[in-house]
């Protein structure tokens, strides 16, 4: 498996949209591991509960408090200023899917094996489709609408989100994900 994708994609040479795409690549890797665990549950096989718990924390921390926070607090408002409505259209769909994903992760944390397996299937399908929509529709639109100055401000805002999550968080998450991919 590819473990060379950086988990700290907001770099001085990367656009904020490129940073979000890199984060999607990391999230897709974690979804692959989660999907394997879900398949084991569906097949009645034992599952490493610690690994499952770690993945749920990864999705809460990296996908939601880092990645979705950047979108919801920074990217989406920037796009709203260019006329995209928050309640409908692409932004409305993305926000609804973020909420649906949060509910599925909460459900996985509180469910029995059969319900976890079902929630895993739903979450993996939701996020893969969501990522595809953002990468192929929303992000190209953002790159088209946002000026260089707006993109620089967005990159700075993304850095602030990163700093608020604590030092070395992404490196620790990437190391943990790489361990799970190898196991």
Q: Where would I find each of the regions flagged by the language model?
A:
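Small-residue-biased structural context
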Residues: 1-183
